[in-house]
Swiss-Prot record:
Belongs to the DNA mismatch repair MutL/HexB family. Pfam families: DNA_mis_repair (PF01119), HATPase_c_3 (PF13589), MutL_C (PF08676). This is DNA mismatch repair protein MutL. PANTHER family: DNA MISMATCH REPAIR PROTEIN MLH, PMS, MUTL, DNA MISMATCH REPAIR PROTEIN MLH1. This protein is involved in the repair of mismatches in DNA. It is required for dam-dependent methyl-directed DNA mismatch repair. May act as a 'molecular matchmaker', a protein that promotes the formation of a stable complex between two or more DNA-binding proteins in an ATP-dependent manner without itself being part of a final effector complex. The gene is mutL. GO terms for biological process: mismatch repair. SUPFAM superfamilies: ATPase domain of HSP90 chaperone/DNA topoisomerase II/histidine kinase, DNA mismatch repair protein MutL, Ribosomal protein S5 domain 2-like. GO terms for molecular function: ATP binding; ATP hydrolysis activity; ATP-dependent DNA damage sensor activity; mismatched DNA binding. Keywords: DNA damage, DNA repair.
Length: 627
């Protein structure tokens, strides 16, 4: 077959394969054209899920009679003229393909009138050559586009359309997304002549929140946290749901870049990281977030349907989004999906200790138990009340007796083939299986409890291993071993600046070597400002503005103490910041921790502060009493 130039209609139909996927794609392209035309009212009429009719009416600037023919031609647009225009594009559309592509797979009528014209004109492309005919029409200032019988001339495409209900659901979701992107525009959606959605223009904060509630639902608003952050020429604002407002599916996740609807992997990854450890694996965050930046710093011409963008400084944007959301969530005082709490009296015989200890721990220095009065300035988002006390009140416990060690201290191993039980959320212990009873004298893993404890059994006796305490113990020992060489520092793409009083600024300069050993590098940012440029991986996902003043306070209090004692305290502090009480574990991670504990501590795991006996006596007596 010789090379030939394709007929216009076939070329447009090929282009329509990328632009026009389904009726909602047509609605998207046409509504975006209306918004680019400056419309503040857009009406959308749908019949039969869009298969029979799609009509978009707006009150925008309209298209002049002389430009109607061009409007239905390929690669004809008023939005770009040079490469510089494309690289800094602000409009939603810019390729000039939508109308030509849609008209090639439907019967399209384009009616428009500008403010300067006394009458409206109507254009329609017909025939093999897509010749455009123009005739007078009655129409107010603005534009109406009617798309009738979508895919009438491409039966294969029409065959793949879903049911009327499904196709309209896609259109409805699209309109919801548009409603959140342009609060200043009134949107009306009708289906088969019935008004389904009506969003009035929202110009005040209260009106915007009402629209947000109308789109996302009242439950979202009950848990919504307003966020706003700015760095250099990048701004992030919007709303995100606290963890208790998480959903069973990801149907309330809306992100916009310079007003453009977006499903970007980089943005989604940063948001997931910000929620890390706050949500169980079967729950999804809900959010409506807007990112604004210099149009020259983002490439929107990377996806046929413009669903994705490419940031020129992707890592910078990722870290900015993560840090802004992470800080907002933690400063709000949110709690994770799990909090370590004392277990019920019927299950655990010993109270849960408030601090993490370990066998053979060296006694704390006297100064470390003292209360501190330092509070960071308000401009640095002052340290949470009581954080200094929490950091300073470590009391050395009494070491476990030999009898206690013998009573609990057999080697802990994992039974081959053991796996998680059904629901790990129950706090009641499970009865050992027959397989578990085949290994007398050895503790064996049974299941997770509340995704934070590992249930163990030995000779019919049950016990709980605190996974947070186990991981903290392992990390603490690793830090002490690595202390001599120092922790590796990782650069922050977004350096953190905060104000400090003069005494702490002097402390930073005096203890520069110690801070570098912890993987922290700071430099002066002015009279009373310090800038944090590098941190250890352990602290990369923490609220650094809150933690740094707390750390400096601890160093100041212990500056006169023995170097080894100070190292001990600082390692413990790093551990507590790096591993949250709210961390969630899966069974494989729990088994890995158990294996490492066995390798490092052997029978010293008898320490009752990490492994606690579970008593079923009360429950069994109750069963016996009930007969």
């Amino acid at each position: 077959m010789p090379i030939r130039i394709l007929p216009p209609i076939l070329a447009n139909q090929i282009a329509a394969g990328e632009v026009v996927e389904r009726p909602s794609s047509v609605v998207k392209e046409l509504v975006e054209n209306s918004l680019d035309a400056g419309a503040d009212r857009v009406e959308i009429d749908i019949d039969k899920g869009g298969a029979k009719l799609i009509r978009i009416r707006d009150n925008g600037c309209g298209v002049a009679k002389d430009e109607l023919v061009l409007a239905l031609s390929r690669h004809a647009t008023s939005k770009v003229a040079t490469l510089d225009d494309l690289e800094g594009i602000c409009s939603l559309g810019f390729r000039g393909e939508a109308l030509a592509s849609i008209s090639s797979v439907s019967r399209l009528t384009f009616t428009s009138r500008t403010q300067d014209q006394s009458e409206a004109w109507q254009a329609q492309a017909e025939g093999r050559e897509m010749n455009v005919t123009v005739k007078p029409a009655a129409h107010p200032v603005g534009t109406t586009v009617e798309v009738v019988d979508l895919f009438f001339n491409t039966p294969a495409r029409r065959k793949f359309m879903r049911s009327e209900k499904t196709e309209f659901a896609h259109i409805d979701e699209l309109v919801r997304r548009i409603a959140l992107s342009r609060f200043d525009v009134t949107l009306i959606l009708r289906h088969n002549g019935k008004v389904m959605r009506q969003y009035k223009a929202a110009n005040t904060v209260a009106e915007q929140e009402r629209r947000l509630a109308a789109v996302c639902g009242t439950p979202f608003m009950h848990h919504a946290l307003a966020v706003e952050s700015e760095h250099s020429d990048v701004r992030l604002w919007g709303w995100l749901a606290l963890p208790e407002g998480a959903r069973p599916q990801n149907d309330l996740q809306y992100t916009y870049v310079n007003g453009r609807m977006m499903r970007d992997k980089l943005i989604n990854h940063a948001i997931r990281q910000a929620y890390d450890e706050l949500l169980p694996t079967d729950r999804f965050a809900a959010y409506v977030l807007y990112i604004e930046l210099d149009p020259h710093q983002v490439d929107v011409n990377v996806h046929p349907a413009k669903h994705e963008v490419r940031f020129h400084q992707a890592r910078l944007i990722h870290d900015f989004i993560f840090q802004a959301l992470f800080t907002a969530l933690r400063r709000e005082g949110v709690s994770a999906a799990h909090q370590e709490e004392p277990l019920a009296e019927t299950l655990v015989e010993l109270p849960v200790s408030g601090q993490i200890e370990y066998p053979g721990q060296a006694p704390r220095p006297e100064w470390y138990g003292a209360e501190h009065s330092y509070r960071a300035p308000a401009s640095t988002n002052e340290v949470r009340e009581g954080s200094a006390a929490r950091a300073g009140n470590y009391q050395p416990p009494e070491p476990p007796s030999r009898e206690a060690m013998r009573s609990m201290g057999a080697l802990l191993t994992t039974l081959p083939g053991a796996g998680p039980a059904s629901a790990a959320s129950a706090t009641a212990a499970m009865v050992p299986s027959a397989a578990a009873q085949t290994a007398p004298g050895v503790w064996q893993a049974l299941t997770l409890v509340e995704q934070a404890y590992l249930l163990l059994v030995r000779d019919g006796q049950l016990a709980l291993l605190s996974l947070v305490r186990a991981e903290r113990l392992l990390l603490r020992n690793w830090l002490l071993e690595a202390w001599g060489q120092g922790l590796a520092a990782q650069p922050l793409l977004l350096p953190v600046s905060f104000k400090l009083p003069k005494n702490l600024i002097a402390l930073v300069e005096a203890q520069e070597r110690l801070l570098k050993r912890m993987g922290l590098e700071l430099k002066s940012g002015g009279r009373d400002t310090m800038i944090l440029t590098r941190v250890p991986a352990l602290l990369r996902q923490t609220d650094l503005v809150r933690l740094l003043p707390e750390l400096l306070q601890i160093i100041e209090s212990g500056s006169d103490s023995d170097a080894s004692q100070l190292a001990e305290v600082l390692c413990q502090w790093l551990v507590e910041q790096g591993i949250s009480h709210e961390k969630i574990y899966d069974f494989s991670t729990a088994n890995r921790l158990l294996t490492e504990l066995v390798a490092d501590f052997s029978d010293q795991l008898a320490d009752i502060r990490m492994v606690r006996p579970v008593s079923l006596t009360t429950v069994l007596e109750a069963f016996a009493h009930d007969g």
